[in-house]
Amino acid sequence: RFFLLALAGIQFTHILDFMIMMPLGPEFIKELNISTHQFGLLLSSYTFAAAIAGIFATYYVDRFERRQLLLSLYACFIVATLACGLAPNYEMLFIARAFAGAFGGILGSLVQTIVADSIPFERRGKALGTVMAAFSVSTVAGVPLGLFLANHIPALGWRAPFVFIALISTLILYLGYRNIPKISGHLDHVHEGSRFNQIFKIVTAPQHLRAFIFMAFIMITGFSVIPYIALYLTTNVGIHVSYISLIYLCGGIATLMSSRFIGHMADKYGKVRVFRVLAIISLVPLLVTTNLPVTPLWIVLINSTTFFVLVSGRMIPAMALVSQVVDNKIRGTFMSLVGSVQMLASGIASVVA
């Protein structure tokens, strides 16, 4: 129980570190005197750095014991996040975000690798649902609390959420140190040939290519919309900025309640079937979100909550499927590449959108 809780905590903080930027968009634009395009670049600095770091990680991720690597990277992530809160200007914040993305991106794929290494496929959907509920918790508690701190600690302003994330991450680092066991089964396998040839074989395997393309399209469809929800609702739909926390809160609570249920359904009825259903249904709130005129708050809440549940829900059966197409001995490398594809796709979507 504490094993999955520690992994979920790591996921929670690095997802929150990424997500907190989105609802703070209007404040960043105002306080740093930047354009919407520059804000998009600030978001993409995290994702592109995560993508590049994930590619570099393929060279070493399967050559270290999982626990030691996870905790070391998490400590570096904490330092980078604190640097975001201490950044004096846009340029330094841009650099700090890139470092946070580099460490955070590897953490995400490494956590999923550890779950896949430790939990049998038959129960993996529910386990991933537990860990990926971190996304929900970050929206339920993290994002509203981050916005509250930013609005009610004038001395820190937008810096407050990053300081908060660094502090809570330090506690989770200790929890992980005490409860995550040593995971070294993958080190028993002999890696033949040069590391480059191994990675090339992983990248070019047909089933792996299909998985990369699959994950890229999932991320593009979500992150062409998600980063700009707060800006779109306040600018085009007429929602007051004070209600943004409520929108994320409702979406997060609903996603938290649905994550384990979706994981259970994926284990019971099949990952492919559940993914197809969620993918088709999610098109409705996706299209509504991008075409909303000035609309009453209650309608916005219904649509945005449905959007969060379905768009994030797709990832649970999707990740369970993707984690199964690769052997245990190269899973860390493969999942790092999957993480890089996810971050690269979301970064491109953020810039193009």
Model-derived regions: residue spans:
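Cytoplasmic helix-loop-helix junction between adjacent transmembrane helices
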Residues: 96-134
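Conserved MFS/SLC helix-loop-helix module at the cytosolic interface between two early adjacent transmembrane helices
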Residues: 52-88
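Extracytoplasmic gate region of multi-pass secondary transporters
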Residues: 21-22, 208-249
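Helix-breaking motifs and short loop linkers at transmembrane-helix boundaries and internal kinks
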Residues: 33, 65, 86-92, 238, ...
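Juxtamembrane intracellular "pre-TM" segments in multi-pass secondary transporters
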Residues: 181-212
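A late C-terminal transmembrane helix in Major Facilitator Superfamily
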Residues: 329-353
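C-terminal transmembrane helical hairpin of 12-TM major facilitator-type secondary transporters
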Residues: 272-317
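Helix-loop-helix hairpin linking two adjacent transmembrane segments in secondary transporters
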Residues: 130-178
